[in-house]
Amino acid sequence: MRIYDLIAKKRDGGTHSREELETIVNGYVSGDVTDYQMAAWMMAVYLRGMTDEETAELTDVMAHSGVMVDLSPIPGIKVDKHSTGGVGDKTTLVIVPIVAACGVKIAKMSGRGLGHTGGTIDKMESVPGTKTALSQEEFFAQVNKIGLSVIGQSEGIAIADKKMYALRDVTATVSCIPLIASSIMSKKLASGSDAILLDVTTGTGAFIKTVEQSIELAKLMVSIGTHHGRRVAAMITDMDTPLGHNIGNSLEVMESMDVLKGRGPADLTEVCLQLATNMLVLADKGTPAECRAMAEAVIADGSAFAKCKEMFAAQGGDTRVLDDYSLFEQPAARYELLAEQNGYIVENDAEKIGSASVLLGAGRQKKGDPLDFAAGITLHKKRGDYVHKGESLATFYGVADKFEAAAEEYRSGLVYGAEQPAETPLVYALVTKDGVEHY
């Protein structure tokens, strides 16, 4: 069937066979299908949708467009975690050592930041000397020896997704649920883990803005994973407000270490404990209550922090900075952002905060941009807090000539009010193959 006919079929609301999806996806990877044809087909998917079975087949075709990682040399159940992204989303650096300290093997591939959201690999590389590009042999050997490793995603994984994502980004088809689900799950299936916990963020700082849409996406991804024989669960977490107080690479590492030392912010600690609990449940470590107790215990006895240091040391990192934060690269300058009036912070748009941190140099506006590891923002006041005029809302770190533009961006997402806004939950729901449990 010609690509023209396949575009027309989806435009008219038809359902594709696996063979047709292979023609589209593999043709795009090989260059037989052009960008403009793929863009037309993806817009047809955006407007007409896909059945769950069709999306599961698309995911598998995308996964098989590149390397399929075989984790069988690592014994036991391997559990992975994926976040759909957010501002100040530093949970991976906390939960991976917690779960590994409880005896579960973690062989995780993570990404870099793009747009207003940060990436785990960038954060890890702010620890001097840390290597995130390991060979497969080094990766497996480290996981077998110490129980965990987090590395950058291989260029060879889900090749179709890389091309399709870049095209979606410039054709207004990013927020299409079947295309988001197949993008995420193709990488997860190709990465080889037995069980996957998805952290589906929702709100202003996330790509999906409503709880209802986030649940729809989570159900579809759980269905895809189950269809392919993986254990999958998804938590719907709030991203209207950044987790914790720090946004920026080394700043987020410091805050993550504080959680592992038992002195982190309450919101970040709670979300990390819930994520770790569900990963342990997927790994058959016990009931939710037993797994929660295990996660709390490895923070309390210091073994989770020790496991984190062990991982950084194995990957060449200078672990002294994890104990003494003054050894991190220091910012060139700092700036206090002051409240312009009295009142409650009714809105503090997380996407605007993330964009402000990018302007400071903590993130990338385009692929390949250099990062300032010391740049970022520390929040002193968050949504729901009362502030007095002249009080510090946040401290900016970076190069002085970037402060004005970042402050303008930050303030554009700030709304004051006379009434304290209602509190939003940290976690909205847990989605499994058995259904949706609302919190």
Q: Where in the sequence are the language-model features?
A:
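Acidic, glycine/proline-rich low-complexity segments that act as flexible tails and inter-domain linkers
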Residues: 1-88, 307-318, 433-434, 439
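Gly-rich Lys/Arg/Thr-decorated short loops/hinges at beta-loop-alpha junctions or inter-strand turns
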Residues: 3-5, 120, 161-169, 202
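Well-ordered secondary-structure scaffolds
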Residues: 5, 17, 28, 68-69, ...
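Alpha-helix C-terminal capping segments
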Residues: 47, 93-105, 187-192, 224-228, ...
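Glycine/serine-rich anion-binding loops at beta->alpha junctions
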Residues: 77-100, 104-116
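General beta-strand structural signal in soluble alpha/beta enzymes
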Residues: 106-110, 132-135, 150-153, 197-200, ...
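A glycine-rich helix N-cap at a beta->alpha junction
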Residues: 123-149, 219-225, 229
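Phosphate/diphosphate-binding glycine-rich loops and adjacent basic-rich segments that engage nucleotide
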Residues: 144-193
